[in-house]
A protein has these predicted regions:
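Bacterial N-terminal signal peptides
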Residues: 5-15
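A composition/secondary-structure signal for short, hydrophobic, low-basic-content segments
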Residues: 15, 33-34, 67-72
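Extended, charge-biased low-complexity segments
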Residues: 23-28, 35, 40-42, 59-62
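Conserved small/polar residues in nucleotide/adenosyl-binding loops
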Residues: 241-243
Length: 243
């Protein structure tokens, strides 16, 4: 009996790699409508999305989009991450800002948390030329981080045009500071493509480009963001189709 079990196990182990090399099944067209697929994704991610402090905000965004109540303990973690000097919290802030803009259309933030959200947006360090010293390493210079910081600064400035931020600049000044840098970034992406091409950073670049396209008040920025987003998706399709 033990030899039979060994034989079965050996055959199974040999079969697994062979099976893994078989072509994947796929369809040339979706099996359901866009709204059905969107609802399925939001339902799944609302319950199973990342709980990591940097990325937990995306689960909360999915919950808001699907009509579920926010997890307040997780939202407090989101605010804490943004108020910290932690590297990559520009990912977190860009998603939170998207939620803030969507909340203006259909309210889902509880009243008791809105003050803390505003405080962390006004206090954020939006670029390395802010006089406040970083207490930990923060990456500003790579392709995705450049635009994440500038997008967050533009959208934050739009929200609080006349309000003084912690660094002494008001919202309009932040908008001007961000626009100058964003226009150059968008021009370079459209002319030369992405230096972080076909990388996992595309997902955060989709986020920032969608934020600009959906919420930027400047029509030129909005138009250019749409064109660069089209270019990014074209890159993805070329890779998928093995052209």
């Amino acid at each position: 009996m033990k030899y039979m079990m060994f034989t079965v196990l050996l055959v199974w182990l040999l079969a697994v790699p062979t099976q893994a090399r078989q072509p994947d099944d796929y369809w040339n067209s979706p099996r359901s409508t866009y709204e059905e697929r969107r609802a399925l994704f939001l339902d799944y991610y609302s319950e199973n999305g990342s709980g990591h402090p940097l990325y937990g905000v995306f689960r909360q965004a999915a919950r808001a989009a699907s009509g579920r109540p926010l997890e307040m303990d997780k939202m407090r973690e989101v605010i804490s991450v943004i108020k910290s000097n932690r590297d990559c919290n520009d990912f977190t802030l860009n998603c939170l800002l998207r939620m803030v803009y969507l909340d203006k259309k259909q309210s889902f933030f509880p009243t008791e948390i809105k003050g803390s959200i505003e405080e962390c947006i006004l206090d954020f360090k939006y670029w390395w030329d802010d006089g406040r010293r970083d207490t930990t390493y923060r990456c500003y210079h790579t392709e995705n981080h450049q635009a994440l910081y500038h997008t967050a600064e533009l959208l934050a400035g739009q929200l609080y045009k006349k309000t003084k931020f912690t660094n002494g600049m008001n919202g309009k000044q932040h908008m001007a500071h961000a626009k100058e840098r964003l226009m150059k970034w968008l021009e370079y992406r459209f002319r030369f493509g992405f230096s972080e091409w076909m990388s996992t950073y595309y997902e955060v670049e989709v986020l920032l480009l969608a934020n600009l396209y959906d919420f930027a008040e400047d029509t030129d920025i909005r138009s250019k963001a749409g064109m660069v987003l089209d270019l990014l998706m074209f890159d993805v399709e070329i890779g998928r189709a093995h052209v």
